[in-house]
Design a protein with these regions (language model features):
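Acidic, metal-coordinating catalytic segment for phosphate/diphosphate chemistry
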Residues: 12-51
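Generic N-terminal amphipathic, Lys/Arg-enriched alpha-helix
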Residues: 3-14
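Active-site segment of metal-dependent pyrophosphate-handling enzymes
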Residues: 100-136
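Short acidic (Asp/Glu) patches
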Residues: 34-38, 48, 87, 117-125
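Histidine-centered active-site/metal-ligand motif
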Residues: 47, 67, 79, 130-134
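Conserved Nudix-box catalytic region and its N-terminal flanking loop in Nudix hydrolases
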Residues: 60-104
Length: 136
């Protein structure tokens, strides 16, 4: 993933309030300061992840997945991988890996960012990971 592509998408994102503006700024700072902002080994402060919001055709139901390590129901998503050329590729790969969905109709065909979040991830000693943040 080319950081300049994500930077352009983040700069085009319209924050929804003060918290959103702060998170947008922190994401841009991570892109500007980290040599590997997409690497899951980047734990200080963290790294970028990508997720999808999946609705049924009537837009009445939302797909959530139980995250076993965290014990939370979350939208499908995960870490960037080396072969991910852009945000859309990462989202579609994660969606396929986690749900088995291979064909989806994008409501947002340009894959523009419509929501951002920075959330804390607790240490996972079994993976040798300390606490960090996901910039999603």
């Amino acid at each position: 993933m080319n950081p300049s592509v994500l930077r352009s998408q983040l700069e085009a994102y319209l924050p929804q309030g003060t918290r959103d503006r702060r998170q947008q700024q922190r994401m841009l700072e991570l892109l500007n300061s980290s040599a590997q902002p997409f690497s899951r080994s980047n734990l200080s402060p963290g790294h970028f992840t990508a997720s999808a919001l999946v609705l049924d055709p009537s837009a009445e139901r939302l797909l959530l997945i139980l995250h076993r390590s965290l014990g939370l129901w979350l939208q499908p998503g995960g870490h960037f991988e080396n072969g991910d050329e852009n945000l859309e590729a990462a989202v579609l790969r994660e969606l396929s890996e986690e749900t088995g969905l291979l064909q989806v109709e994008a409501l947002n065909p340009d894959c523009q960012i419509f929501d951002i979040d920075i959330h804390n991830i607790p240490a996972n000693p079994s993976k040798g990971e300390g606490p960090h943040q996901h910039f999603d």
